[in-house]
Amino acid sequence: MLLIKNGTIVNPAKHQHEVTNILVEDGKIKEIGQNVSAAGKEVEEIDAKGLFVTPGLIDMHVHLREPGQEAKEDIYTGTQAAAAGGVTHVATMANTKPVIDNAAVLRDVKHRIAETGVVKVSVIGSISKDLEGKQLSEMGDMAADGAVAFSDDGHYVESANFMRRAMEYADQLGKMVIDHAEDMTMCGHGFMNEGKVSYAMGVTGRPATGENIAVARDLLLSELTGCHIHIAHVSSGKAVDLIREAKAKGVNCSTEVTAQHLYFTDEWLKHYEAAFKMAPPLRTNEDRKALIEGLKDGTIDAIMTDHAPHCNEEKDVPFNCAPNGIAGLETSLASTLTVLYHQEGFTIDKIVELMSVNPAKLLGIEGGVLTEGVPADITLIDPDKEWTVHGQDLYTKSLFTPYEGLTLKGKAVMTIVDGEIVMKEGKVLK
């Protein structure tokens, strides 16, 4: 039994923002209120004075790499990293080896999660067999076994007709399709955003137009099929405009942005550091500002990480040879608080909405709310705690982080999953 006292409860789903107490018993929230007590019972008291007490953060886009790529990350280390970052639930993508394109692989992954997961994990099935965009995956069987959505993330579904069929099928199953929207005929040979910085560096670029074309196509297909399309990791200001216009027309669409695209721009790549290499790439400061405006007006629904760790030796190579992707679970909240809360004036309520409430709604999973009777998935946040990021101190297997040596402001100081403290003051306890 836990009694969280004197914390500021931030519970946007219930329009609640007040200093109060939470009693947790048998893995669930038993009571919330000023006069809550556990008289006569053995209870661990947590003094949360000066802290925000929020629904557990939910990251709807991570790559845990298991099975098949455990040298990069595995379910245990990836969920340890999640706990360290205040995340109580993640959704893992299908680009494992073998690909999660059938119910047998999905069940195997869920078994592994049950054995070693530190936080909760939902599984996203692939759209196509082996991520090749040619044959539909076993979407119906995977939906029956608990797949929360479908995505070939890391790969763009090139054929519009194939994507149409996939969306029609997913819509029948009541599932969302998540697309990595970059037209690879334009972007496939690029290493960073195409623009002034890439020209000065002499590096082949990935034009934002490639993203815009893909986003426009996906929105049109959603309008045609009625299927919920979720645009992964939007990075282009023009793409945000397209999504805003589609939402105004009633198209069934949503989108997300990574914390790193809100913090960094392509200017950070001037020293050819592979830690900043990702897809879609970091874009201009104008794009970054457009992403922030998209969050302000509700065009962008969620903040996530696209946690995509690689082996250290894979990243410690010349820039053009390094794979795309960074580890982000342990820095996402702090990066977001630094930029949005401390610099842009976002309320903590809005940030919790973007990092917990909305991801739960989009994935159709429990979470995003603090109320009596629900699982006690809770994050305690110190918004003013300053800390310096060092890759060697992180729980993820990937030591390369674009935040290396940077001081961020704000940090999760406790993570509770089903009433159990899994992280306290930066130390993961499982």
Residue ranges and their predicted role:
Residues 7, 318-321, 342, 375-430:
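C-terminal cap of metal-dependent C-N hydrolases
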Residues 134-303:
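Histidine/acidic residue-rich metal-binding segments in metalloenzymes
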Residues 49-113:
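Metal-associated gating/positioning segment near the N- to mid-region
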Residues 1-55:
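Histidine-rich, glycine-flanked metal-binding segment
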Residues 200-228, 275, 296, 301-303, ...:
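His/Asp/Glu-enriched, well-ordered alpha-helical/loop segment
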Residues 54, 103-120, 168-179, 331, ...:
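Alpha-helix-loop-beta-strand connector modules within alpha/beta enzyme cores
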Residues 7, 22, 27, 50, ...:
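Divalent metal-coordination and catalytic microenvironments
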